A protein has these predicted regions:
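Active-site-proximal, substrate-binding regions of enzyme catalytic domains
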Residues: 2-128, 139-146, 150-151, 164-168
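Short beta-strand scaffold positions
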Residues: 133-134
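Short, flexible loop segments at boundaries between secondary-structure elements
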Residues: 155-175
Length: 175
């Protein structure tokens, strides 16, 4: 079974910078497990990267080592022409708006992109299972609620990345 791990901006913000223990704990766990965190291009932009760059890292990204070492990877552009991806992203935006009692237009673009990326990697067969690591509970709930409605039952897992999660993280979380 192939598992893809998708992370949001909040994971890196919650870690602090590269000199912080939580960041190093995440780095160590991923490297020991031999896996990477995939981030949508929208998340890369939120982290300060230049989306027009030909290679990563770029811009003022505060986590260049993660990209250079290969444990943070920027995902390919979302395929908005794929009806599943665009539908799931629209549904995710509505779901998050309802969960947070906000207008759809005020939802950060990176949140639906997380769910869209999960749908895309499952739909293309790139992964059999997706683990979404996020500090955004509504986005995680959107993924766990919506993707099964599109034929991906038992193929998405939401992990809330709390401070405690990061402090106790080991490679076994990624195996």
């Amino acid at each position: 079974m192939t598992t893809v791990y998708i992370a949001d901006t909040g994971v890196f913000v919650r870690c602090g910078g590269p000199d912080k223990d939580k960041f190093q704990q995440l780095r160590r766990a991923l490297r020991q497990a031999g896996v990477s965190l995939r981030i949508p291009q929208r998340v890369y932009e939120e982290l300060g990267g230049d989306p027009a760059a030909d290679e990563y890292p770029s811009g003022n990204i505060p986590y260049p080592d993660g990209f250079e070492e290969g444990w943070i990877v920027v995902a390919d552009e979302l395929d908005y022409a794929n009806p599943l991806v665009s539908t799931v992203m629209d549904e995710a935006r509505r779901f998050i708006a309802n969960e947070t009692d906000r207008d759809e237009d005020s939802i950060e673009k990176a949140d639906p992109a997380l769910v869209g990326l999960a749908a895309q990697v499952l739909d293309t067969g790139e992964a059999d299972h997706v683990v979404l690591l996020t500090t955004d509970k509504p986005a995680g709930k959107a993924a766990e609620t919506l993707l099964p409605k599109h034929g991906f039952s038992d193929r998405i897992e939401f992990r809330y990345v709390s401070v405690e999660y990061l402090e106790t993280l080991t490679a076994t979380e990624f195996r």
